Curated annotation (Swiss-Prot):
This is UDP-3-O-acylglucosamine N-acyltransferase. Keywords: Acyltransferase, Lipid A biosynthesis, Lipid biosynthesis, Lipid metabolism, Repeat, Transferase. The gene is lpxD. Homotrimer. InterPro entries: Hexapep (IPR001451), LpxD (IPR007691), Trimer_LpxA-like_sf (IPR011004), UDP_GlcNAc_AcTrfase_non-rep (IPR020573). The active site is at H238 (proton acceptor). The lineage of its organism: Bacteria, Pseudomonadati, Pseudomonadota, Gammaproteobacteria, Lysobacterales. Its EC number is 2.3.1.191. The keyword Nucleotide-binding does not apply. Catalyzes the N-acylation of UDP-3-O-acylglucosamine using 3-hydroxyacyl-ACP as the acyl donor. Is involved in the biosynthesis of lipid A, a phosphorylated glycolipid that anchors the lipopolysaccharide to the outer membrane of the cell.
Length: 337
């Protein structure tokens, strides 16, 4: 595919600075782009690369346009504009409708004639696969699941039981949705398993990363509202609810019955304690541990920032002395009263 800068600008509401007839046929970073490729400048730290890039077209903000060496496309948000334009060059393979001969489908399951069911797929009793879905190789859809129109299970995805995917949900390889939640009760020194009778409900336009696990609820469903984006290797425990348009980065763990609001961002390796609530528009930075509910929007952090080993050891030793030091300060204060 080849597009001119003017064609791209017209399609996405951008302003051309330079030669609108400049053609691009692909995308790349500023540092590695060459002739015929489009790049973008969103982070100021990469501004020095603008003078050296070989990209034919660069998406940038208006105040950077004069520094562009070639044709520029001016956007209010260059990164978002780049994401939309790059999608034009991301040509997905065409999946022809039909069911592979090796797939095993229960007689009570229903599969749309426009769906693609790949090799070694299993679809259980009472489940339904909607129009235009792609069920990739080795995926397992258990009993009583719904995969609504336009969904894609890329490969080796497991929907255990009572999982409902909304429209246009994308699930990456190795993800497991609808496994038992971690519900246990102690009785006479032995664990008793608490039956997990709920399900998992995923809203429209969600994306679930590779090897992520979302457990089904004990009594009520585990719910991801619409347009939630979950990275790889995330654990979402039973009965959690994730608000619409939130994003969760890799290796994050969310304990049972936690409620996270709309438009929240959780960085990598965040831990969220169970049975708490996080309000809308909260940002939790990477490696933080959320131990209490959050009722005010904003950015929150915890954890120990990286420093050199010698300084860290000194600080750790002093941290152990904080209680004794606090007691001494209190004692001095009382003596001076």
């Amino acid at each position: 595919m080849r597009l001119t800068a003017s064609e791209i600008a017209a399609q996405f509401g951008l302003t051309v600075v330079g030669d609108g007839a400049t053609e691009v046929s692909g995308v790349a970073t500023l540092a590695h782009a060459g002739t015929g490729q489009l790049s973008f400048l969103a982070n100021p730290r990469y501004r020095p690369q603008l003078a050296e890039t070989q990209a034919s077209v660069v998406i940038l903000r208006a105040d950077d346009a004069e520094s562009a060496q070639g044709t520029a496309l001016v956007a209010k948000d260059p990164y978002t504009a780049f994401a939309k334009i790059a999608a034009l060059f991301d040509v997905a393979p065409v999946r022809a409708p039909g069911i592979h001969a090796s797939a095993v489908i229960d007689p009570t399951a229903t599969v749309s004639p426009t769906a693609h069911v790949g090799p070694f797929v299993s679809i259980g009793a009472g489940s339904r696969v909607g129009d235009g879905c792609v069920i990739g190789a080795g995926s397992i859809i258990g009993e009583d699941c719904v995969v609504d129109d336009g969904c894609e299970l890329i490969a080796r995805v497991t929907l255990v039981t009572r999982v409902r995917l909304g429209k246009r949900v994308r699930v990456h390889p190795g993800a497991v949705l609808g496994a038992d939640g971690f519900g246990l009760a102690m009785d006479a020194g032995h664990w008793i398993k608490v039956p997990q009778l709920g399900g998992v409900v995923i809203g429209d336009d969600c994306e679930i990363g590779a090897n992520t696990c979302i457990d089904r609820g004990a009594l009520e469903d585990t719910v991801l509202e619409e347009d939630v984006r979950v990275d790889n290797l995330v654990q979402i425990a039973h009965n959690c609810r994730i608000g619409a348009h939130s994003a969760i980065a890799g290796c994050t763990g969310i304990a049972g019955s936690a409620k996270i609001g709309r438009y929240c961002l959780l960085g990598g390796h965040v831990g969220v304690v169970g049975h708490l609530e996080i309000c809308d528009k909260v940002v939790i930075t990477g490696k933080s541990v959320v131990r209490n509910s959050i009722h005010e929007p904003g950015e929150y952090s915890s954890g120990t920032p990286l420093t050199d080993n010698r300084t860290w050891r000194k600080n750790a030793a002093r941290f152990k002395q904080l209680d004794a030091l606090a007691r001494r300060i209190l004692a001095v204060g009382k003596e001076n009263q």
